[in-house]
Amino acid sequence: MFCVQCEQTIRTPAGNGCSYAQGMCGKTAETSDLQDLLIATLQGLSAWAVKAREYGIINHDVDSFAPRAFFSTLTNVNFDSPRIVGYAREAIALREALKAQCLAVDANARVDNPMADLQLVSDDLGELQRQAAEFTPNKDKAAIGENILGLRLLCLYGLKGAAAYMEHAHVLGQYDNDIYAQYHKIMAWLGTWPADMNALLECSMEIGQMNFKVMSILDAGETGKYGHPTPTQVNVKATAGKCILISGHDLKDLYNLLEQTEGTGVNVYTHGEMLPAHGYPELRKFKHLVGNYGSGWQNQQVEFARFPGPIVMTSNCIIDPTVGAYDDRIWTRSIVGWPGVRHLDGEDFSAVIAQAQQMAGFPYSEIPHLITVGFGRQTLLGAADTLIDLVSREKLRHIFLLGGCDGARGERHYFTDFATSVPDDCLILTLACGKYRFNKLEFGDIEGLPRLVDAGQCNDAYSAIILAVTLAEKLGCGVNDLPLSLVLSWFEQKAIVILLTLLSLGVKNIVTGPTAPGFLTPDLLAVLNEKFGLRSITTVEEDMKQLLSA
C-alpha cells in the first residue's frame, strides 16, 4: 500500500504516505492496492478512447463510466474491494469493445501505452492485490526522484477531483465532448509514467483549466434543473417526526428522495455538502425538507449514531459506520461503498423510507436555530454593484474567501479563529464543508449585507470566480488587484483540483492549510510559491496582518 492523496496521510521523517495494513482514512491495504489496479485499467481505457476519437468513434458509455469509476477511488468514497474490482472488470470490457470498434475501422489500430492491454490475472482478491503492486504510484521513486513523483501525483489527484465533478455534472445530464476528450488524453498520458517536470507542470495547469469548464457545466446542470439558489434560512435543529438524513453532493438523489417521501410523514435532513441544497427553489419547495443536521463530515460517527433514522450517502465522505453501530441503517448510493452496508443500485428509495417509518424519529422539536445559505452565482452577481459601492464609500475594506474542506486535525481550528478575527468592515465569502468551522456563529452585516455569505458546495468556487472576474471588470483592474484574499483549507482531491483551477486562471497569493499536501516536496512548494505566491498558513494574527496590508 502507498497512498498520500489526502491531508490526514501519515507523515514521518522517513517519508509521507500511508503504507501499512490500513490508511488513516480506514481504507485497507487491499482496497488501496486494488484502487491502484483500477486506475491502471482506466488509463488503458482512456488510451483506447483517445485512439477511437481519431477514427471518429465516441462511445458515450465509455465517457460516462471512466470518470465515475475514477471517482470511486477518491478519499472516503468506496472501501468495498469487490466493487472496486468490478469497476476494473467493467473498464476492461469497455476497453475491449472500444478496441474492437477501432479494429473494425483499421485492422492495424494500435495503442502505445503500457496500460492498453492490461488484464486481471485472477478472480482472487489476494492475487489481484499482488498484481496491483506493479502499479503502486511510487514504484519508480528511486529512479525518478521525489519531485517528479510529486508532480505526477498532483496531476493524478487533480484529475481525480475533476473526474468527480464530471460525474456530478453527468448525473444532471451535462456532457461536453471536448471535456471528455481532454480527460482521456490526460488520463492516458499519466498511464505512461511521464517524468518530464515541465510537461507535468503544464499538465497540472491544463487540468485546472479543464476543471473550470467542468464546473461551468455542473453549475448549468444544477441551476437548470433546480433553479438559481437564493438566500434561504435553514434550521439546524431537530423537528419532531420520523426522518432520513442525506449526505454528499448529489442534488438529483436528494430531489428523488424528496419526491418519494412526500406525503409519507418522513422528514428529510441534509448533512455536510448537501446544506446548500436548501437554497435551490425546486428543492426547498418540499416542505418536509426541514433542516440541516450535524457538522463537519469528520464528526459523523458520533452524530450519525445519534440520528434516529436511516442515512443515505450519495458521494464522499463516508467513514467506518461500525464505530457508531449504525451500519444497519446507513445506505450507499452510486460510487459510494462500505463492506457489509446496503447499497442502492438505482433511484428507488422505498427501502430507506420503510426503515425510517419503522424507527422512532425525533420525539420533539428543538428551539430553531436558523442560518442563511443560498448565495449562488446569480445572487452574487446581483450584489456586485453593492459591493463596489461599499468599497468606494470605505464601508467595506476587504473580502476573504474562507472555504474548502473540513477535517479532524486540531490545527483546523485556525479557520474558526480566522473567521472570528475578521474585522467588522470585512466580508467572509465561504463555500464547501470547511464552513462548518464557523457557519453557526453570528457575524452581523454591513448596511444590510450579511458579513458571512455562503456560496455553496466546493464546486461553487465557480460562482466565486465569476464574481471576482465581474468585480475586476467593473473596477477596471485584475482579479489579483481586488481587495480579496483566498484562505483555503484542503483535505482531498476535489480541493486539489479547485486549487489547480485557481492557479491556472492566474489567481495569486492564495493561503492554504492546515498542512501542505504530503506529495508536494519542499522544492515543488518553492516553485508554486515563486510562480503563484502560494503559501501555507502561519498564525491568524500574522496572516490577517499580511493579507489586509497587501
Swiss-Prot record:
Q: Which Pfam families match?
A: Prismane
* Coiled-coil ranges from the UniProt annotation: none
Which of this chain's residues are annotated to bind hybrid [4Fe-2O-2S] cluster?
249, 273, 317, 405, 433, 458, 492, 494
Q: Where does [2Fe-2S] cluster bind?
A: 3, 6, 18, 25
Q: Which cofactor does it need?
A: [2Fe-2S] cluster; hybrid [4Fe-2O-2S] cluster
Sorted alphabetically, the keyword list is: 2Fe-2S, Cytoplasm, Iron, Iron-sulfur, Metal-binding, Oxidoreductase
Q: Which reaction does it catalyse?
A: A + NH4(+) + H2O = hydroxylamine + AH2 + H(+)
Q: How does the cofactor bind to this protein, according to its record?
A: Binds 1 [2Fe-2S] cluster.
Entry's Gene Ontology cellular component terms: cytoplasm
The protein depicted here goes by the name Hydroxylamine reductase
